[in-house]
């Protein structure tokens, strides 16, 4: 498996107690994070860099979603949209950076199709199923459709919604209340653009000595208190992250400086996402850490941060530690999806109509870890929903580390099919309080079993 070779250094860090939380998804290559806060959870939409890169370029066919209530354990919701959802487009590659928003109980996912413009999907749930409500691209009449990428959506305090996008300049429209059309009576058939001056976005000299705007792509627009923020990828290849502020969402914007500088383990592209969640602030971005430097195989990371008193954003450094403090302990006495993971090695996830998302590609020595599990006064039994079309294997249940205290071993037997699910159980030693919990998988050669959920009793 292509991801397995990337874990050696990170796995050693975990064994030595140097807790790694970044990148926050290890089962797939993910990029262009778009976090959305809804109903006590963060839903993060990402692009998906395929394991196999075709023609030495971004190979991206679909969009994935993850969610978390505590910012350390992330639940994989699988592929929530793909290029195939747009039957009017003939593109088989180019599922680039999306963003989602909720309005009036509906969820709108704005998807750029490289070379086919910005499209939109809608669903009744943040994890879908999404469908195409208009049967065509959303944005028309732009100067160059190849530059119509990286949409960011924002609803202002007065209810007016805006969609911004673009490389190498920022365009925007005023969305109508339905979120799937826009006001064409303003601008050029509805399309407007920001002033791309050095005052607005900073500047640097190009190869001809001409000072040009720093802005490159990946805009992220939001409001905090009375100030509007536009965070973006800047200064070409390799990119760093910068930001500008304004007192009106339509500008004028004022350049404020860097948020994240270039670094050796960052990919040659970057893409920001910024949220406040449960009274804390988080900055999302991507690196090529998981792929050992392959720029077309990126991985999402996140850093906690605090605004300065004047509202400015401090300079942030990418770290392996990421979010070190959980916002809430995990309750193991209710069903926990196996694809809720803080860290893992060697695993993949798949999705079926019978069970939804489950953990797959489980081989001997692979593991997953869940952070801050609250055992309360202790548990006596471990139960798991599993399926195996071979001789199966076992799940070692360990406390605090890969080689931590062994609470018990759940034997997984043959269930007569990889999608034939059974509940299998094991007695465990009593543990009290809050601990990280490791599931270490053991068995023979090849795939051992699939893992859908677990709970304690």
Task: Please identify what each model-predicted range represents.
Residues 20-457:
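Carbohydrate-active catalytic/glycan-binding domains of CAZyme proteins
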């Amino acid at each position: 498996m292509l991801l397995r070779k990337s874990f050696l250094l990170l796995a050693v860090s975990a064994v030595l107690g140097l807790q790694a939380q970044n990148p926050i998804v290890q089962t797939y290559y993910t990029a262009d994070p778009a976090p959305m806060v809804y109903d006590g959870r963060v839903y993060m939409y990402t692009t998906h860099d395929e394991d196999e890169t075709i023609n030495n370029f971004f190979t991206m066919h679909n969009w994935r979603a993850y969610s978390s209530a505590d910012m350390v354990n992330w639940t994989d919701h699988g592929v929530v949209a793909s290029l195939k959802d747009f039957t009017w487009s003939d593109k088989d590659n180019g599922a680039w950076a999306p963003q989602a928003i909720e309005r009036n109980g509906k969820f709108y996912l704005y998807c750029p199709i490289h070379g086919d413009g910005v499209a939109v999907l809608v669903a009744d749930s943040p994890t879908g199923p999404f469908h195409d409500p208009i049967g065509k691209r959303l944005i028309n009449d732009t100067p160059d459709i190849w530059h119509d990428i990286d949409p960011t959506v924002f609803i202002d305090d007065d209810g007016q919604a805006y969609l911004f996008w673009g490389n190498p300049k920022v365009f925007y429209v005023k969305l109508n209340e339905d979120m799937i059309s826009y006001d064409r009576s303003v601008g050029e058939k509805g399309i407007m653009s920001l002033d791309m001056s050095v005052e607005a976005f900073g500047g640097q000299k190009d190869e001809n000595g001409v000072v040009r705007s720093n802005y490159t792509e990946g805009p992220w627009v939001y409001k905090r208190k009375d100030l509007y923020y536009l965070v973006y990828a800047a200064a070409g290849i390799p990119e760093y992250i910068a930001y500008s502020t304004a007192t009106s969402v339509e500008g004028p914007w004022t350049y404020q400086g860097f948020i994240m500088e270039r670094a050796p383990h960052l990919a040659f592209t970057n893409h920001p996402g910024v949220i406040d969640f449960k009274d804390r602030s988080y900055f999302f971005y991507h690196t090529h850490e998981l792929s050992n430097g392959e720029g077309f195989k990126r991985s999402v990371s996140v850093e906690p941060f605090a605004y300065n008193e004047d509202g400015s954003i401090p300079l942030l450094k990418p770290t392996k530690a990421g979010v070190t403090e959980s916002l809430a302990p995990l309750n193991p006495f209710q069903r926990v999806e196996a694809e809720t993971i803080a860290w893992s090695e060697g695993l993949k996830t798949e999705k079926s109509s019978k069970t939804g998302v489950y953990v797959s590609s489980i081989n001997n020595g692979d593991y997953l870890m869940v952070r801050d599990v609250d055992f309360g006064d202790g548990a006596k039994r471990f139960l798991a929903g599993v399926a195996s079309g071979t001789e199966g294997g076992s799940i070692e249940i360990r406390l605090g580390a890969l080689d931590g205290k062994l609470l018990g071993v759940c034997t997984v037997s043959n269930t007569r099919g990889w999608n034939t699910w059974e509940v299998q159980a094991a007695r465990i030693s009593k543990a009290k309080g809050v601990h990280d919990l490791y599931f270490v998988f053991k068995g023979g050669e090849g795939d051992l079993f699939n893992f859908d959920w677990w709970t304690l009793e």
